[in-house]
Amino acid sequence: MEHQDLTDSRKDPLCISQLKISSSSLDPLPQANMAEDLTKSRRHSPIKVEGSEETWGVEDDDDLTDPIFDTIEGNGHSDPTSCFDADLSEYKKKATVIVEEYFGTNDVVSVVNELKELGMAEYRYYFVKKLVSMAMDRHDKEKEMAAFLLSTLYADVIDPPEVYRGFNKLVASADDLSVDIPDAVDVLAVFVARAIVDDILPPAFLKKQMKLLPDNSKGVEVLRKAEKSYLATPLHAEVVEKRWGGTDNWTAEDVKARINDLLKEYVMSGDKKEAFRCIKGLKVPFFHHEIVKRALIMAMERRKAQVRLLDLLKETIEVGLINSTQVTKGFSRIIDSIEDLSLDIPDARRILQSFISKAASEGWLCASSLKSLSADAGEKLLENSSANVFKDKAKSIIREYFLSGDTSEVVHCLDTELNASSSQLRAIFVKYLITLAMDRKKREKEMACVLVSTLGFPPKDVRSAFSMLIESADDTALDNPVVVEDLAMFLARAVVDEVLAPRDLEEVLNQTPEAGSSVGEKVIQMAKTLLKARLSGERILRCWGGGGIETNSPGSTVKEVKEKIQILLEEYVSGGDLREASRCVKELGMPFFHHEVVKKSVVRIIEEKENEERLWKLLKVCFDSGLVTIYQMTKGFKRVDESLEDLSLDVPDAAKKFSSCVERGKLEGFLDESFASEDSQSKKQNGSSSSSG
């Protein structure tokens, strides 16, 4: 991912750029604590930051330097119970030991396991503080190790609010740190800048903390130095990442290449001890399913190596090097790609079935946890050739859309490629759209949301797309460590845009092959948390700069968009050009909100009969061009129906006029013949029952 100047690189709270290797598939924190942890993460829900278009950070009413949050330093409110003090004291001792051992061994997995075993997730902010403060007084090697460990633990082991709080404590204690560490201001400034570059801290952290600290404090010096000396310079991301010599950690592609190399060397030599050493050296236990997958594919391709490779997998499981979950996932990924594999290995299905039978009989695979290899009779499978052709075309269409922003062109292209029965292809398109957007800037993320809303795909297809995205989240996390947060935001946005209903969230989880997986549960729970937040709709809409994708504007509030619609209709009705009015509707950049154009147009028709034909022409042009979909048209009419009672105060015969509008809408093809004024009918029924009473 590209890193730009600070003012250009700010991202939403749930969209974080590439780290090297993430432990996103590590075992999650106990499920019982998940709801509480996610509730605490609301302190990072999107908000507006003064003087910028930034939308993430910590809400003003949750002051992280307030004494209520300061329970470990003794300079604020502290729990009076001795139990609390004992727990915290014990945690401090063990955290110090864990950090010391980590600096000696560089064993990330050991740290993960020890923190989980230690528990007490509410104190993990102290681990962040202790890790950084101890590294500050050591060599560059330990500083780099600390920065890498924080990136690895972020979100999976240490929740974002705890990381934020840990850095808050560090900055607040900069004066004390400077007593023992002469260059504490500079070193801590680099740590803060590195955390922002690695996206484990939001850029809003700087301004937020500056407002809370005394102007003459060392903490303010740290924040200013981080901003001006490290984050405001050209190529700042690269400079910050290499400040302490960089790391020898690898990207996803590096890991895959190393896995291939170790398997090839093992096939040639048969040296299991060396293979085990190489697997341990990768230090990516959450990615061991890739070893299983690649070993199985290599065994299919090299018949003579089958026995040796299967024997390697068996022993890695017996000695506990690869756990059963990773084995199951590796086999499942092969099953998912069996159709593609069959193009190169004609009897791939038969060979894989024999591998499954052998592994199950030897006791190192639970075959019952795998999907069936036989084609699902209830779902029409796509021809491999046509599916592959569509995937390539889909990527091309999406990339072109990100450049042009032309939704109508995408609709036209998909109309050509798809038919009514192409449910699987529609899901694939949405999956690729969101996947490509997640690796780009806020503008493309916003454009992806707009396009999903505009396409009007059936909810079932969109649910399938998100299920596929969740299923592949562990792999995506290697390049995007916060894929969970990204997917949660995309899901929440789909609900706000009414592409999905709130009840569809659970269905997404149920459709995921690994139903009940920790990743799926995290995504769904986080999406629900986002949707429950105060003013969630507007926040989610504005998170990626909602509105004005063609002008790349920072976004508009719902109120501002309504005002723009009102103005463009007034100008058009008073003699404006039809083409200009259509252009203005398009440039709103919020096709999911076009029902408001329909609503206001119909209301004006009811109120000003002499201008109705001009407004009908505008609606027809917008509808025929695809600018307003039948879904948005129907929703607009329904919203007028819901407001008839208020409208009748100014226009006594509003209900009658609206009925005429509905008939005209059906005649023009805007509305389905089944459209009925449900609210009006219920009001009539209520009225008749009350009058009879």
Swiss-Prot record:
The entry's keywords: Cytoplasm, Nucleus, Repeat, Translation regulation
Region (Disordered): 25-60, 673-693
GO molecular function ontology, one term from the record: ribosome binding
Intracellular or extracellular location(s): Nucleus; Cytoplasm, Cytosol
Induction line: Induced by dark and starvation.
Domain of life of the native organism: Eukaryota
Compositionally biased intervals (Low complexity): 683-693
Ranges of residues in domain MI: 90-211, 254-375, 389-510, 560-681
Gene Ontology cellular component list: cytosol; nucleus
Motif Nuclear localization signal 2 mapped to chain: 430-437
Pfam hit, one: MA3
GO BP terms, alphabetized: negative regulation of DNA-templated transcription; regulation of translation; response to absence of light; response to carbon starvation
Motif Nuclear localization signal 1 per UniProt: ranges: 241-248
Tissues expressing this chain: Mostly expressed in reproductive tissues, such as flower buds and flowers, and, to a lower extent, in vegetative tissues, such as leaves, roots and stems.
InterPro entries, sorted: ARM-type_fold, Initiation_fac_eIF4g_MI, PDCD4
Subunit structure of this chain's protein: Binds to EIF4A1. The association with ribosomes is modulated by cellular energy status and TOR activity.
Primary role: Involved in target of rapamycin (TOR)-regulated translation control, especially under energy-deficient conditions.
Protein name (Swiss-Prot/TrEMBL): MA3 DOMAIN-CONTAINING TRANSLATION REGULATORY FACTOR 2
